[in-house]
Amino acid sequence: MSDSQFLTAHGRFEAARRLPRLDPGHPAHGLHGHGFQARVRVPAHALPARPGAGVQELREGLSQALRPLQYADLNRLLAHPDDAALAQWLRERLGTASAQAAVELRSTPAQGVAGDPGGPWLSLRRHRFLAAHYLPNVPPGHKCGRMHGHGFEVELRAAGVDHATLDAHWAPLASRLDHVLLNDIEGLHNPTSEVLAAWIWERLRPGLDSLHSVSVLETGSSGARFDGSDYEIWKEFGLDSAVRVRRAAAGSPPARLHGQTFRLRLCLSAPLDRVLGWVVDFGDVKTLFRPLFDRLDHRPLYEIEGLDDTDTATLADWIFQACRAELPQLSGLRLLESDGCGAGVHVGAATPP
C-alpha cells in the first residue's frame, strides 16, 4: 500500500452563541460562550506551497479563516451555530484546500464534531471513569500484571446523533465501569485498552447503528481505537530538538538556527494477539523506538545524515521510514510543532492520526 503525507493545523477562538433550535430549557439555548478549538488536515499535495513551507501556509490559512470568529457573536454569522454548522462554515473558507480538508471542531475538550471530505459530520463525546485493572496474561515481572488503575477516558464518535444521545447511550456503561475492578466484569478478564474498546463497541452498537469508533485512553500519551473491524493503538513522545530549514527563504525565521518542541504520535494497527489482547505492548513500542528517539531528542537535527531538511513535513516522513523496520505494524504518525500544527504520514486507507 502507498504512503500518504498530510499537513495539519490547529487554532483556537473564543466566541458566544445561542442554539435556538434546542428546547428552551436546554442550557445551550440561551446566550453562552466557549473556547473553541479547530483542527484541519489536508493532503500535502493540496497546498501549492514552496518546498518546506506547507505547514506554515496551512497555519496561516486556518488563522485567516478563524479571524471572523474570534470574540464574535456567532449567531450573526449562522442562524444555528452548532458545532457541525461551524465546522462546515470553516471548511468552506480554507481556500484551495477546502474540498480536501478534514475538519475537527471542539466546543469543549469533551465534545465536538469531526468530518472527512465527502463524509458525514460525526458527533464526538468524551467521558471519563476511574477503574482498577491488571493484565493476567503478561509475562512474569511485567508492571501491568500488578494491580493498578487509571483515570480512563473514552471517546465515542457517531453520525447523525447529538451529544445528548451519545451521553444517554453511554450512561448505563458508565455505571458499570466507574470505581470498579475491570477484571471482575464479564468479558473483561484481560482488560487491555483494545479489549475494553471492543467491549464498549459491542454493547453500544446494537442500539446505535451509526457508531463510528470507540477510543480508550489509559494515559495522556497512549490509547486504542476500535471501529468494529480494525484495532489501532497510539503512543506519543516529546522531542526537544534544534532545527534549521535549509529551503526556507534566506533571512526568514525558519532559516535561522532555532529550537522546536515536537509531539510525535506513532500509530500501529494489527490483529489482536489472542493471548495478550493487544496490538503491541505500549512498553515494547517505547523500547523499539528508543534508539531513534535518542537520535532525535536534544539533538541538532540538521546534522542527521540522510535527512534532507528539518521542516516538519520532511522530518515526519523521515521518521516514518526510519521506524518501519522495527515497527512493521506502523500505520501512521503525526508530528506536531509547539503550537499544534504539523505533518504526518499514513498507510493506504488507514485513518490519519
Where are the regions a protein language model picked out?
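Charge-rich, low-complexity N-terminal segments
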Residues: M1-P353
